[in-house]
Amino acid sequence: MEYDDKLVRFRQGHLNPFDKKGGAERHPADSETQPCKDSSTSSPLSVPEYNYPDRVMDLGVSEDHFSRPVGLFLASDVQQLRQAIEECKQEILELPENSDRQKDAVVRLIHLRLKLQELNDPLEDEPNLRVLLEHRFYKEKSKSVKHLCDKCSTFIWGLIQTWYTCTGCSYSCHSKCLNLITKPCVRSKVSHQAEYELSICPEAGLDSQDYRCAECRTPISLRAVPSEARQCDYTGQYYCISCHWNDLAVIPARAIHNWDFEPCKVSRYSMRYLALMLGRPVLKLREINPLLFNYVEELVEIRKLRQDILLMKPYFITCKEAMEDRLLLQLQDRQHFVENDDMYSLQDLLDISSGRLGCSLTEIHTTFAKHIKLDCERCQAKGFMCELCKEGDILFPFDSHTSVCQDCAAVFHRDCYYENSTSCPRCMRLNLRKQVQNPGAEP
C-alpha cells in the first residue's frame, strides 16, 4: 500500500505534456486505492488547464519541440498566409528586443512572405530562349538577388522569380516584363551603325523631347515633377530615373578632343552601347583630331610600334617557324594592329592613357624583332645591305636608324639615304633592266 501511495503522488506531480485533457488519466488501480480525496488535498497537485488556440500562425511555423523544417507550411491559402504574417509580426513586437525567440520569429516571417510571393507569382515552365526585338533572352539559373530589372527597376528575386538576360546586350528583366520591352537590342545598332557620337554632350533641350524621356517617353521635368530628368553625357538627351541609373562611362568625344577619360553619367542604353563599342577600332585619329599627336607623346610611340609591326608582318607570313609558333596571335585581342596603323578603339586610348598598352606592345615588338634578327635564319636572309655605303650590318625596314625607299622598298642607313636622296641605286637598276627588256619604252 505504501508503494501504491508513492506511485499515485508521483503520477500527480509529473504531468504528461502530451495530455491535453483537464485532468490526468488515472489508473484503475489508483481509483480503487484512493476512492476519494477532499479538495484541500488534491488542490496543490491538480493538473493545470492547457488551452491550445487554433492560430493560423501555428500552421507549420509555430515554435514547438517538434517544429517542421523551415519553409514547410501547412497553410496553402493566400488568406491564411496573410493572417499568419500579421500574427507573426505581432509576435515579433511582443517578444523581447534582440532575443533569440524574436530572431526566430523574424526568420519565420521571411519564409512566410516568400511563400506568399511564390503563390502570388508562381513559377511557370517557361522556355529557355525568348527572341524579342532582336534581343536573345536566355533564362537565368542564378538564384542571386543582386540584379535589378532593366525594365521596372526593381529587384529580381532569383529564388522565386523567373528572369532572362539578353546575350547580346546583357539586358536583364523579369519574365513578366518581357512583353513590355520597346527598345531593340543595342547589339543590332552596333552591328549596323558602328560609330560614335563625336560631339561633346550635344544637348538640344527638353523642349525638343516634348518634356518626355528620350527612351520610354515618360513625362519628365528638371524640377522632378512628375519625374526627375537626368541628362546623358554621351547623347545629351534627358531620361527618366528608370532609364537613367546614373551609371558612369568614359565618353569617346571627351577622350578624343580633350584627352579626358573621366567617367561621366550616362543612360542605361548608352552604357550598354559604349560597353559593346569599347573594343571596336572605329576611331581614325588622324582625321578626327590630327593635332592630338603633337601633344600626346604616348600616341607617337604607339604609332611607331604599330608601323614596325606592319613591316614585320610579311616576314612572319612567309616564315614556317613563325607560323608554327603563332607569333602574330600575340595580338589577337587587337587584330587591327596587324591590319593598319591609324585605327584605334576606345579601349586602346584608355590603355595608352594608363600606360598599359605601351608596355605590352613594346614587349611584343621586342619578341618579333628577336625572331627576325636573331632566332630565324630564313628571316635574317631577307635583310638588306646598304647599297650606298656598302658597310655595316644587315638592315631591316623596322630598324630605328634606317630609311626605306618609297618606290622599291629598299633599305638604307638613314644618313646615307638623305645624303643621296636624289638617287636610289636599286631604282636605277630596275629602270635600266626595264629599258633593256623594252627598248621602245620611255625611261
Curated annotation (Swiss-Prot):
InterPro entries attached to this UniProt entry: C1-like_sf, DEF8, DEF8_C1, Multihaem_cyt_sf, PE/DAG-bd, RH_dom
Alphabetical list of PROSITE patterns matching this protein: ZF_DAG_PE_1, ZF_DAG_PE_2
Role according to the record: Positively regulates lysosome peripheral distribution and ruffled border formation in osteoclasts. Involved in bone resorption.
Annotated Basic and acidic residues bias: 17-30
Cross-referenced Pfam families: C1_1, RH_dom
Signal sequence annotation: none
Keywords: Metal-binding, Repeat, Zinc, Zinc-finger
Bias-annotated ranges (Polar residues): 31-45
Family as reported in the entry's similarity comment: Belongs to the DEF8 family.
Region (Disordered): 14-49
GO molecular function list: zinc ion binding
Identification of the protein by name: Differentially expressed in FDCP 8 homolog B
Biological-process GO terms, alphabetical: lysosome localization; positive regulation of bone resorption; positive regulation of ruffle assembly
Zinc finger (Phorbol-ester/DAG-type): 134-185, 364-424
PANTHER family per record: DIFFERENTIALLY EXPRESSED IN FDCP 8 HOMOLOG, PLECKSTRIN HOMOLOGY DOMAIN CONTAINING PROTEIN
Gene (UniProt): def8-b
